[in-house]
From Swiss-Prot:
Gene source species: Phalaris aquatica
Matches recorded under SUPFAM superfamilies: Group V grass pollen allergen
Signal peptide limits: 1-25
Protein name: Major pollen allergen Pha a 5.2
Any coiled-coil regions, as ranges: none
Keywords: Allergen, Signal
Keyword Cell cycle tagged: no
Superkingdom classification of source: Eukaryota
Region (Disordered): 65-87, 279-299
InterPro entries listed in its UniProt record: Pollen_allergen/Os
Homology family: Belongs to the Poa p IX/Phl p VI allergen family.
Keyword Cell membrane in record: no
Ranges of compositional bias, category Basic and acidic residues: 65-85
Amino acid sequence: MAVQKYTVALFLAVALVAGPAALYAGDGYAPATPAASATLATPATPAASPQHAGTTEYHIVRKAGLNEEKNAARQTDDEQKRSDEINCPDFNKSVHCRADRLPVCSSTSAHSSKQDVAWMLGYGSIQGFSMDDASVGSVSSEFHVIESAIEVITYIGEEVKVIPAGEVEVINKVKAAFSTAATAADEAPANDKFTVFVSSFNKAIKETTGGAYAGYKFIPTLEAAVKQAYAASSATAPEVKYAVFETALKKAISAMSEAQKEAKPAAAISAATTTISASTATPAAPPPPQLGTATPAAVAGGYKV
């Protein structure tokens, strides 16, 4: 079913951001005291297992665990309702699920571990649900789940401080644009929903950011990928919809993470290259340059016009 599989893909998309974010959080946290775990329906992992309990990620998981039993009860009581109606309001609370299933974070395994656990939790969360697979319900669910995914990414970025403050602010504006576009699309006829979403989203994001978002690497990437992923919902075969949706989101979120990790090293390499160019462009120039005319070395040194 389309909505179920889209939900799994979005779990993966969030994990692709959370994984690199965890690498910047550090591995030196001491285990937290297990007092709060008494409220969980399932006991936390044994004390001997290093869970990096001081990280923001762990606390997100702990909060999610407190809501899991309540959410499961609601789903049981409302079997005739669409699962997207039941789950979407609680997406932010249950995105990572139980604390005892959080993988150990390390600089070498966090990224792949989070992809694995995202698939596991995403698949497990859809088992046994009653689902209305109507296209209109699917469209509405996708919009709101994407909006919630943006919210989770924003929260992780603010807490772990991987994403610069300016880009976190832009993410908040993108989230607001999603909300505006989703509302407009929900009210449009079924055949016009995608067109209305794209036009409303473009208008809202330009109004809220003033075009400044184009200066950031991953905002335009995310914008384009979500449109491409949603456009795939017009395909007739569910497996084709899902493959395109998953691929587009995976590439976009991976590109966002990589651009963020490589931004500073790339800037340093660029500066070093400029310095080398400046020192080698003019062969054996006299130490005190007396000429008033700019030399080729000065031009190579990176003067901005």
